[in-house]
Regions:
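Conserved structural motif at the start of ABC-family nucleotide-binding domains
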Residues: 3, 18-19, 75
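Walker A (P-loop) phosphate-binding loop of ABC-type ATPase nucleotide-binding domains
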Residues: 36-40
Length: 290
């Protein structure tokens, strides 16, 4: 499964350009899309799920051009987990999934088989008789993931799947996506750096509708290497001065004083600053603020 995006632009009627002349190839496995809220990630995913037509440029899914004549064919190959998954609150989990299977045109016996399989995979089998409105946010997200997989898509798109979840549920969702990516391509959109550290090797960093970086995790980390320092000071005025001069990826109050992680082009001249290893969060802040 290959997805290619060529010179894609989306400009809304109010003149706002949400996606600005982007190019991208999404390989098999999990591909991360990292960016702050408002970066253009959701608009891009609306194009990839055929909900929104681009202003210009093109998208190809295994060589099939995104256009109205091909949308039905493309939709059969795509599964989508939106950020909000408030599915039919009065139905039970199983009833909801059976209904989604009917909408997808899956034969009932095959639908039951797939529902049983994915309920087990997502640890929802014991909750299948619960009403959707009784579920926690994490459980609803897992039901949403099952509905996105019922028709066995080749390309799975997930939008901020861990937002608002507790740490245990966040880990569960990430592990499920890694598992499901063995047989398909997954586009994982998030603003949570930790999500991508745990799931993928390749990613794109998006800001204001453009890609600032596309490539491997290691290459992204290398971009910030030599540009990250740590300083610990008890002098609050010095800490404020450093915050004005550098981008800050971390600030902690410790027994020794205020500990800052600084990002910039040149090593700080202030005493006590030392070079340190780069984290993905450091690298993300570095490339988005150059």
């Amino acid at each position: 499964m290959s997805i290619r995006i060529d010179d894609l632009t989306v400009t809304f009627k109010n003149g706002v350009t949400a996606v600005d002349h982007v190019d991208l190839e999404i390989p098999h496995g999990i591909f991360g899309l990292l960016g702050e809220n408002g970066a253009g990630k959701t608009t891009l995913m609306r194009v990839l799920t055929t909900v929104l037509a681009p202003t210009s440029g093109k998208v190809l899914l295994d060589g099939t051009l995104y256009c109205e004549a091909n949308y039905e064919k493309i939709q059969k190959k795509i599964g989508y987990l939106p950020q909000e998954t408030d599915l039919y609150p009065s139905l039970t989990v199983r009833e909801c999934l059976e209904y989604m299977g009917d909408l997808a045109g899956i034969e009932k016996r095959e639908s039951k088989k797939r529902i049983d399989y994915y309920l087990e995979k997502t640890s929802l089998a014991d909750h299948q008789k619960k009403k959707m409105r009784q579920l926690s946010g994490g459980m609803k997200r897992r039901v949403g993931l099952v509905q996105a997989l019922l028709h066995e898509p080749d390309f799975l798109i997930v939008d901020e799947p861990t937002t608002g979840l507790d740490p245990e549920e966040r880990i569960r969702i990430r592990n499920l996506l890694v598992d499901f990516a063995e047989e398909r391509t997954v586009l994982f959109s998030t603003h949570v750096v930790e999500d991508l550290m745990a799931t993928c090797n390749q990613l794109a960093v998006m800001k204001k509708g453009r890609f600032l970086y596309t490539g491997t995790m290691r290459e992204l980390l290398n971009k910030a290497r030599g540009h990250v320092w740590e300083c610990c000071t008890e002098d609050e005025s010095l800490a404020r001065e450093l915050e004005r001069k550098y981008h800050i990826s971390s600030k902690q109050y410790t027994e020794e004083g205020i500990r800052l992680r600084l990002l910039g082009e040149n090593m700080p001249s202030e005493s006590g600053c030392i070079a340190c290893d780069v984290t993905l969060e450091d690298a993300y802040i570095y490339v988005t603020n150059r």
